[in-house]
Design a protein with these regions (language model features):
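Divalent metal-dependent hydrolysis catalytic cores, especially in the metallo-beta-lactamase
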Residues: 1-15, 37-49, 76
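Glycine-rich phosphate-binding "P-loop"
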Residues: 44-58, 167
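Active-site-adjacent C-terminal substructures of enzyme catalytic domains
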Residues: 17-40, 64-184
Length: 184
């Protein structure tokens, strides 16, 4: 018996221009997924331009994914690359939800990315967030809760795409991701 997962990027990350615009538009698909026990893997980031980039995970979880989880309580969901305390809290509040955590969200904070200058190597989506969020992610990652697990989200880009005026989001961590995890 084969199983598969559906990834819903919602036009929020690199190369996801064809993603959907609102989770609730896909209720008929989620109903079938729940019935057939197909998990939903989701990049949880709002695409609303009025939402600050550092608040997009929380906005998406509150406005979109919470409604899906409420309507489909048996649908298994994975929030990919959680970046905030809000993401951790969301997973803990929903027994059918798990979450992946990346090496870069565990080891860096937004000051590393933007201060004293912008570092394209640390630009990813969801963006690296506050130091308090990072500490919460680390505490959760080493806490033993099986709802949380490693998701490397390694995303290499050609040099011209990563360091240009329109730097592509994504961190290539395949070469060192496990070492970062071991250090934590």
């Amino acid at each position: 018996r084969q199983r598969c997962a559906v990834v819903s990027h919602m036009a929020a990350t690199t190369n996801s221009q064809s993603g959907g615009s609102a989770m609730l538009n896909y209720n008929h698909i989620f109903e079938a997924m729940e019935e057939k026990r197909i998990p939903l893997l989701v990049h949880a980031e709002s695409t609303d331009d009025n939402v600050d980039i550092f608040d997009r995970e929380a906005a998406f979880l509150e406005r979109e994914l919470s409604q899906v989880c409420e309507r489909f309580p048996e649908l298994k969901v994975t929030v990919e690359h959680i970046s905030t305390s809000d993401g951790i809290d969301f997973v803990k509040a929903h027994p059918q939800v798990g979450g992946s955590i990346t090496p870069h969200h565990l080891s860096r904070n937004r000051s590393d990315m933007i201060s004293p200058a912008f570092h394209a190597d640390l630009f990813c989506k969801p963006v690296i967030n506050s130091e308090q969020d990072r500490l919460t992610l680390v505490e959760t990652a080493i806490g033993g809760d099986p709802s949380f697990f490693l998701g490397t989200d390694s995303a290499p880009h050609p040099t011209h795409a990563k360091y240009g005026k329109d730097a592509k989001a994504g961190i290539f961590n395949a070469a060192y991701g496990l070492e970062v995890i071991a250090e934590i």
